[in-house]
Amino acid sequence: IYHQRAVDAEILIASENYKDALQVYEELFETYEFIFLRDFQIATQLALFLNDEQKSKRLLINGIKSGWKIKSIRNNNFLDKIRKGKDWKSIKKQYHTLNELYESTLNQRLRKRVKKMFSKDQWKAIRALFAFSSKAQDRYAEKKFAPHSEKQISEFLDILNNYGYPGEKLIGNDFWMS
């Protein structure tokens, strides 16, 4: 139901019904314990668009508690109104503490493990680019990539069985397990 309601809000945005879209997001925030960062980001921008600066500040802070990085906030031109507002210095002062709070909710050990798996996959993919001939690519795929993939799948299944899907809620959103 969570994702369906988020889609409902996006449909309202597409039909330029911003006030109702924000209301749908607020209902999501009241109903569910875990909220995806993307939903806080969209709701913050909706509140700004509707000139509700207090609500946008509250949503931005909740977004930071959910992993919204300061660099992303600074690079989002739509958030200029917040960054140029009277509360920005206060938000910046709170950022480190709020980000630490977010980081403390993540399984850091598992995050490192998944990041290492991701790096290994990327390295294998890059190495495959250096097998120039079709025959060399086939040989690499058979001798190196297939065994690597089998190990990765086995480790991924172990993670799924023991922890669940290593997504935004469990390990954060800096990289994706693919």
For the regions a language model picked out, list residue spans one by one.
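Preference for long, solvent-exposed alpha-helical segments and helix-linker "stalks"
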Residues: 2-37, 48-176
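The feature represents the first ordered module of a protein
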Residues: 40-41, 45
